[in-house]
Amino acid sequence: MERVSGRLEKTVKIGYQDVTIERDTTTFQKQTDAYGEYEHRKNTITIQNGLQPLDEANTLLHEILHGVAYINSLTQSGQPLDKEDREEVVINTMTNGLSQVFRDNQWLLPYFKDKFK
């Protein structure tokens, strides 16, 4: 795996963790294969190399939301996302919804950036 370079940073802060962003040169052939993965034990997000920009952004957001869910204990036993399939449905739904909101409202991310100073 090579480190992400270019427009993406090498790390993203999620809660108290600095999570490393890496690229994976694996090419996924099946429709059910993932484009990325969040590994809490390694503190990494891995993204498939060569994705289209929209897919790459959606994948990064998806994996960040997995990190948010894990770091905030939503995946612990007895919590709302304690089952892997439930977690995946919720994360995927929220990711796709937010991606659409950000894409349809180009002013929104700069607005948040200004307000979150």
Model region roles, listed by residue range:
Residues 58-70:
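Active-site recognition of the HExxH zinc-binding catalytic motif
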